Amino acid sequence: TIGTLRPEIASRLGLPASTEVVAVGSHDTASAVAAVPAQAGNFAYISSGTWSLVGLELKHPVLTEASRAANFTNERGVDGTIRYLRNMGGLWLLSECQRTWASEGVTLGLPDLLRAAAALPPGGPQINPDDSCFIAPDNMPERIRAAVRHSGDLLPDDPATITRCIIDSLAAGYAKAIIAAESLAGRTVDVVHIVGGGSQNQLLCQLTADATGKRVVAGPVEATAVGNVLVQARAAGKASGGLTDLRRLVAASHGLQTFTPQQLSRL
């Protein structure tokens, strides 16, 4: 708790002047990482949604030129931690494809798309999800197929195949980011936690386990809100302890799903 509302602000909002102001993890990713249900320090996290934030939780920043060149950032987290992470492409690619397909009269829902994609064999074409050609909206399927053609491969104009390409590419990108973070920070990761909307995508979670060769724990979906509330609860005396204690509450109160590597994917 950092104080109470200024009287003029409280009056404008119709709130008591005694209303407390709590400093939570004020970036949404900071609150999401606070809610990662990890019970040891040897974890990586992926906040997976429209975009992906992949990294480690550290006590000290990594300030090397190699780290900067690898596009990793050092951002403050809850309780003085450092969120050492790389910003990456995410499920924006798939949502944009769905928007294009819907405009063309293809009405496959996400569960059907993912089931069809999961039935395809591994080892198909991949793209770089971070390529700037994927930032703008509109006609994402064709841009993905063009990127595959540019790499010397072909990708059929089929929703299931394009979906599988996206998920394979994200999982491979996550694995590469985790390997780089381990090397640059001098850490070894035993488990990967996926939080946010992407934690509901079972194909993405399984392929991430396959690509990393590590156990993946998925959930909670609303990690940002959970982390925010937990820090407020601690400030109000309704919860206590450090991040490990708060995370123990998350693990005990949310249905988490674990994925183990079934086959090592190519990177």
PLM region spans:
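Glycine-rich Rossmann-fold phosphate-binding loop(s) that bind the pyrophosphate
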Residues: 197
